[in-house]
Every structure is written in structure tokens, then in C-alpha cells.
Amino acid sequence: MVKTLRKRTTKEQKRRHDQTYLSKTSVFRVSRKMADLATQFITESGLRTKNIVDIVHLMVWHLSDNGKKTISLNVLTLLPTPQEPFKPSEKTLIGTELKRVNVRHHVKDAMDLMCAALCNAIRSLHPNVSLRAYEAPDYILKLAINYCSQLSQEDKDVYSAQKAEDRLFSLSVRYFKTDSE
């Protein structure tokens, strides 16, 4: 008797896909429009790196005051392929807790991770800031783009950590509200 393999249904495939590829509890969805905007920014910017994970690491590095503060991030690291995982430089790991998440090479997925990482960093450093859930993804991404634009190719390695954090928080005031409001 020959045993035939049953084809997985679309629902089963989606569930399996969700379980193995993104942590749904810590990833925010972003619109295609915002993903395209961020892609355009990364492509046209003067940053030496075009790897969005490097940009997130750079933001976290400054937010953590060059590693002196601990920032807990639920999602930060992309694994380009299972065989060759992304290995951030040692300095970006200081004061951070990383959870590796295996994702595909889709711009939208990278944007989701960037939003989640930035959101968690802001929450960790500024507990009095609460997100407007209905607009968080797009605004977090706008915030990230604005923040990245402050780090030019010439000064990104010597950028003041305190200035970076102050700049990020001042930008966040436009997009986030505090619990006291």
C-alpha cells in the first residue's frame, strides 16, 4: 500500500509560516506605503550601511548611551539565512538582550522588526510614554526614518549618545503621548 502525502491547506501553511517566521506578539505591522518610503530613504541616504538591522543597532547603541544603559529588545536581529546568521559587531551587543528571529528577505518584514525594536527601546528608556495603538506602526517608522536621517556618513561614529537620545525623545513627542496627558 502506497501512502500518499496530504497537501497542506492554506490555513495550515499560514499557521506554520506564522509560527516559524515572526513573533506576532512583538512585531507591529506597517503599511506598504511606509515600507516603500523607508526603503527609498535607506537607498538614498548617506549612511554607509544599507542593512536595516545595522541601522537599528546603531540607534540602539546611541539610545543605550554607548552600552551604559540596558535596553531589553524583544526583536532586533535578522538572520539572513539559517546557514549564515547575521552577526552584529560586539559593541552593539553591550547592554542589549537579543532574540534572534528567522525572517525572510522582504522589506516589509524588516520594517516590522525595525518598528518593534524602536518601540521597545523607547518604552524601555521612557516608561511614561505610551503608544497610540491605532497609529503606532506608521508613526514609529516615521520616527525611525527621521532619527536615521540625523546620522550622516561623516559623523555617525562620533555622534553624541546624549544628543541622539534627546533628539529621539523630542521627535517622539510629536508621535506619542504620555500617560499624564
Where do the model's predicted regions map?
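Short, basic amphipathic alpha-helical segments that act as recognition/interaction helices
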Residues: 44-78, 117, 121-162, 174-180
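Short Lys/Arg-rich basic patches
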Residues: 2-43, 77-119, 164-181
